[in-house]
């Protein structure tokens, strides 16, 4: 298969959070722990008209993000006990719950906020691209539940060939930090980052 990754069509995302809720449900995550998050981006301004009144050019759009299973994951070398692994076949980055000691250094190292710390079990965990579902021939739960079909997954080379190479938009960390395995079709009103 090669390196797996996500494709996000930001122009289709309505911010409904079905992806986030289904991920939370599948992984039985406590309040405050989200392996997939949906952010709202807003831009524009209000302008006063010379004769009175106000007009606006306010735009809002949404972005769904989880672990990007980066080529150069900052979480991996940050773990002092070696609990984080990048699969050599599919590139999926996972945290071994048997080894994790909850130092939270991975949480601090990831520019995307992917690892989430669970205070109840004193361990960090994150998206594993629903490897268990993939082994049964199913899509990751976030992909399967998106009513707008704004999320896809697959070999990143194929996704890039099909959708291009945009992996950073306004409000996101520089894609040069970790080389995320992510492709984005930006919303028409999104201002692309200058990377």
Where are these regions (language model features)?
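Non-ligating segments of multi-cofactor redox enzymes
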Residues: 1-195
């Amino acid at each position: 298969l090669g390196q797996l990754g996500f494709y996000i069509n930001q122009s289709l995302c309505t911010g409904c959070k079905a992806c986030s809720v289904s991920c939370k449900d599948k992984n039985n995550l406590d309040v405050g722990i989200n392996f997939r998050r949906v952010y709202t981006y807003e831009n524009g301004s209000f302008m006063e008209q010379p004769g009175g009144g106000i007009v606006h050019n306010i735009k809002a759009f949404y972005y769904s993000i989880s672990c990007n299973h980066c080529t150069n994951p900052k979480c991996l070398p940050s773990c002092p006990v070696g609990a984080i692994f990048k699969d050599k076949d599919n590139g999926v980055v996972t945290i071994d719950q048997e080894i994790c000691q909850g130092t939270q250094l991975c949480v601090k190292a990831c520019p995307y906020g992917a690892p989430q710390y669970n205070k109840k079990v004193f361990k960090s965990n994150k998206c594993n691209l629903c490897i268990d579902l993939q082994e049964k021939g199913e899509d990751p739960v976030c992909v399967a539940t998106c009513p707008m079909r704004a999320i896809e997954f697959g070999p990143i080379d194929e996704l890039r060939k099909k959708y291009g190479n945009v992996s950073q938009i306004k409000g996101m960390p520089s894609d040069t930090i970790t080389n995320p395995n992510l492709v984005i079709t930006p919303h028409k009103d999104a201002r692309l980052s200058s990377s």
